[in-house]
């Protein structure tokens, strides 16, 4: 017996993996060899004593093992840093472990919820199945009982026919009759089939996945998918529950003036295909993206059994609610003071003296071009908000807006100039707005100052000052010397105290746009005076036809602020476009609401402009076209720095002209002159007027290439005068006749090659060859024309003086007689100008 008997040969064996070949079988006799390899996880056991050395060991060792050049303090510092790093790593590891634990708990919780849900679903399915089986069992029992009753009746009927001597059959041993075993056996078979079906269904969920046992077992190919099994279970559950139809929900459907079919279906919670089908049944071949009118949509809504709620497009503005503030919520607010008066009466200088800042230096020619909004704190601590309006005749609308948003009007009248046209206009604005007025008689330091004359002239406009037993306060001031400024501030504070101005700062902000402009670096910027509430950075708002989100708030000192309360003027950044001066700013809850309101207002404005420009009848259209034929137009483009200036220029242009010529503003806007403006001007043959703005480089190059004229202005008077002069050039010249002489015909001669020649005596003035003539017979004009020839004796002359005789022949006219009178005149063209 050798050593190898009964023993295996020694050899190497891989410890990391155990490969093996298995044969996988598929349908139709297909097979496939699969290599199955199972790997063991390698466990690394740390060596004894490992990890105990390291930086700490080196640090704890003697100085000979320490790196050269490192002191004890440096080594201690490094040790502390190393310990801190280790502590930080331990803390991070603990944090990661806690996060992982929390995630594991969350996964476990979700898994438990999923299992509970599946368990409830299985229980419901099991109850439904048991109920169905119970009903089936009862039905079969009833059928078996009916069969037994029928068999018993049949046996009873056949019993009398049988032989009476035959003994009845002995019952089979076992006691119970044989047919009674039938129902129990059928019931056991059904239970076994049910248990078998349940087992198959439970295992069928994973039957579509290949497992190792299936691969080694060599059983058939791929089974039904999990999704298929879920669909089958859902169908079985619905069948067991009897497919109970859900109760139809009646909805209140908001119906605008026009609605898209898909949106209508969405609001009714109905299928789009059903809505389209209903419309087609009504004879409307539409798709889901087409718009239908409100009446048709109402019929569809009623057909589907819902309620109709008709709404208007204007209802989008209902989100801007007028909140009635409670008395306990109101808090005192600073007064808003608007300074008004005639141009150059010292309004800005007066405010400059109050603010102790140089505002006048920034205005072109010392004339205010647009509204300035400032806040001033007096020596007594009172805060006043001032609005400085322009005094030009062109800025009527801006002064009107200033009066509408103000609490007190300070009417500035120069003591040496008294009441002027814009002073009267400011008085009317203040009366129309119903705000109290304080008269500031300025320039009292000038030698020609006469305050009593100002007070007397104000009486003509129903402004009775206190010095004349009235109720209007008047203060004599001098912006140059500072005289009377304290008295003016006291008068303003007294008037504000009488008014008891209050507002609620703890609500959504509402304000008025004082001015708006398009800044090159900041985009659309609006100067807003907050009237109630508090405007904060990040608020979503709608203002006129524009909307936006407050990106930044800048006060009158140029500083960024987080919020602005009542009576505080601020610049608002973040608009999507430049609003109109005078628009109301309202804060909304969402951007969608703001956008919807702005779009509605824009569409309403377009419809209004289209309706205003459209002729109502064909006769009106023809009449307008006939009038336009006789009118010459001067087209211009206007670009200004702020919205108020552009508006004032357009209004001034509309006033220029008469029945023969007018100025047409093709486009007015805010911001720099762009290449688009040049293209429009070139197509229309119009010049571009820039007010406090300039053209960019590309616009200048395009203007030079296309020959478009660009004019820059900083004072509105210069712009108006230039446009008026250009419009005057379109007027046809006026023809003026100057009578220079009379001549009487003494005799008529016939001259060959000339025709009839009149022998005349110049009785008055002078007769000129180049002048026009009229032939008068019995003081009736029978011919008007020119002279063919004018001779003295036989010589052709240019003119003949009074008392001399001459020969005259008319151009293309020979019906002349003795004693006719010739009237001699000259025509002169006189250039006309617009008033």
Swiss-Prot record:
Annotated InterPro entries: EF-G-like_DII, IF2_assoc_dom_bac, IF2_II, IF2_N, P-loop_NTPase, Small_GTP-bd, T_Tr_GTP-bd_dom, TF_IF2_bacterial-like
Biased composition (Low complexity): 153-169
Region (G5): 478-480
Sequence segments annotated as region (G1): 341-348
Region (G4): 442-445
Keywords from the UniProt entry: Cytoplasm, GTP-binding, Initiation factor, Nucleotide-binding, Protein biosynthesis
Lineage: superkingdom: Bacteria
GO CC, one annotated term: cytosol
Chain spans, region G2: 366-370
Basic and acidic residues: bias regions: 86-152, 184-205
Similarity comment text for this entry: Belongs to the TRAFAC class translation factor GTPase superfamily. Classic translation factor GTPase family. IF-2 subfamily.
NCBIfam families recorded: IF-2, small_GTP
Task performed by this protein: One of the essential components for the initiation of protein synthesis. Protects formylmethionyl-tRNA from spontaneous hydrolysis and promotes its binding to the 30S ribosomal subunits. Also involved in the hydrolysis of GTP during the formation of the 70S ribosomal complex.
Protein name: Translation initiation factor IF-2
Taxonomic classification: Bacteria, Pseudomonadati, Pseudomonadota, Alphaproteobacteria, Rhodobacterales
Gene: infB
């Amino acid at each position: 017996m050798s050593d190898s008997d009964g023993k295996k040969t020694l050899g190497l064996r891989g410890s990391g993996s155990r490969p093996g070949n298995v044969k996988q079988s598929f349908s139709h006799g297909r097979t496939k060899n699969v290599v199955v390899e199972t790997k063991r996880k390698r466990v690394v056991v740390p060596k004894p004593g490992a990890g105990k050395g390291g930086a700490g060991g080196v640090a704890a060792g003697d100085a000979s093992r320490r790196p050269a050049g490192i002191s004890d303090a440096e080594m201690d510092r490094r040790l502390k840093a190393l310990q801190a790093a280790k502590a930080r790593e331990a803390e991070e590891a603990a944090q990661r472990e806690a996060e992982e634990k929390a995630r594991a708990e969350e996964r476990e919780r979700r898994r438990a919820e999923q299992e509970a849900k599946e368990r409830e679903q299985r229980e419901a399915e099991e109850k439904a199945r048991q109920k169905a089986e119970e009903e089936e069992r009862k039905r079969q029992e009833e059928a078996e009982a009916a069969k037994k009753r029928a068999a018993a009746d049949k046996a009873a009927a056949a019993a009398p026919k049988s032989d009476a001597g035959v003994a009845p059959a002995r019952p089979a041993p076992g006691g119970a009759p044989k047919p009674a075993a039938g129902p129990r056996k059928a019931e056991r078979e059904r239970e076994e089939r049910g248990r078998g079906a349940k087992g198959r269904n439970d295992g069928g969920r994973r039957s579509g996945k290949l497992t190792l046992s299936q691969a080694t077992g060599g059983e058939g190919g791929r089974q039904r998918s999990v999704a298929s099994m879920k669909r089958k279970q859902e169908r079985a559950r619905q069948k067991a529950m009897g497919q109970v139809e859900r109760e139809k929900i009646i909805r209140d459907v908001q119906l605008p003036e026009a609605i898209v079919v898909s949106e209508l279906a969405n609001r009714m919670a109905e299928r789009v295909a059903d809505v389209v089908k209903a419309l087609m049944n009504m004879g409307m071949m539409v798709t889901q993206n087409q718009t239908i009118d409100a009446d048709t949509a109402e019929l569809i809504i009623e057909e589907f059994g819902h309620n109709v709620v008709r709404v208007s497009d204007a209802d989008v503005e209902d989100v801007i609610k007028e909140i009635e503030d409670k008395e306990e919520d109101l808090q005192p607010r600073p007064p808003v003071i608007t300074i008004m008066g005639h141009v150059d009466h010292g309004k800005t200088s007066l405010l400059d003296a109050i603010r102790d800042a140089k505002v006048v230096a920034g205005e072109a020619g010392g004339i205010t071009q647009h509204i300035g909004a400032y806040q001033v704190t007096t020596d007594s601590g009172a805060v006043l908000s001032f609005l400085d309006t322009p005094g030009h005749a062109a800025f009527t609308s801006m002064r009107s807006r200033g009066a509408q948003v103000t609490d007190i009007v300070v009417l500035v009248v120069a003591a040496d100039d008294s009441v002027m046209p814009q002073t009267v206009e400011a008085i009317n604005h203040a009366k129309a707005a119903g705000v109290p007025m304080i008269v500031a008689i300025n320039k009292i330091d000038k030698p020609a100052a006469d305050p009593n004359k100002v007070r007397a002239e104000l009486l003509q406009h129903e402004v009775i000052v206190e010095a004349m037993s009235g109720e209007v306060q008047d203060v004599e001031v001098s912006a140059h010397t500072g005289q009377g400024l304290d008295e003016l501030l006291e008068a303003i504070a007294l008037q504000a105290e009488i008014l008891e101005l209050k507002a609620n700062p703890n609500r959504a902000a509402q304000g008025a746009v004082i001015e708006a402009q398009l800044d090159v670096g900041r985009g659309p910027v609006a100067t807003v005076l907050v009237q109630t509430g508090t405007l904060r950075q990040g608020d979503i708002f709608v203002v006129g036809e524009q909307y936006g989100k407050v990106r930044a708030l800048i006060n009158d000192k140029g500083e960024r602020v987080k919020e602005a309360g009542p009576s505080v003027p601020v610049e608002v950044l973040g608009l999507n476009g430049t609003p109109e001066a005078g628009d109301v700013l309202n804060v909304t809850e969402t951007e969608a609401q703001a956008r919807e309101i702005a779009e509605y207002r824009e569409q309403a404005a377009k419809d209004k402009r289209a309706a205003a420009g459209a002729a109502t009848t064909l006769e009106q259209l023809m009449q307008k076209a006939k009038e336009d034929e006789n009118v010459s137009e001067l087209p211009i483009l206007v670009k200004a720095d702020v919205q108020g200036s552009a508006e004032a220029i357009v209004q001034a242009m509309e006033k220029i002209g008469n029945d023969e010529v007018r100025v047409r503003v093709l486009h007015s806007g805010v911001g720099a002159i762009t290449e688009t403006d040049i293209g429009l001007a070139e197509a229309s043959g119009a010049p571009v007027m820039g007010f406090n703005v300039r053209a960019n480089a590309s616009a200048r190059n395009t203007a030079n290439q296309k020959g478009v004229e660009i004019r820059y202005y900083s004072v509105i008077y210069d712009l108006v005068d230039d446009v008026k002069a250009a419009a005057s050039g379109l007027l046809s010249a006026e023809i003026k006749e100057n009578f220079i002489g009379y001549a009487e015909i003494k005799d008529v001669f016939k001259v060959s090659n000339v025709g009839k020649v009149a022998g005349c005596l110049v009785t008055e003035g002078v007769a000129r060859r180049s002048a026009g003539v009229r032939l008068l017979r019995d003081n009736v004009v029978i011919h008007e024309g020119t002279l063919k020839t004018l001779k003295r004796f036989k010589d052709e002359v240019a003119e003949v003086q009074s008392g001399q005789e001459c020969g005259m022949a008319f151009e293309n006219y020979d019906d002349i007689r003795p004693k006719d009178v010739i009237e001699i005149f000259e025509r002169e063209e006189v250039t006309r100008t617009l008033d």
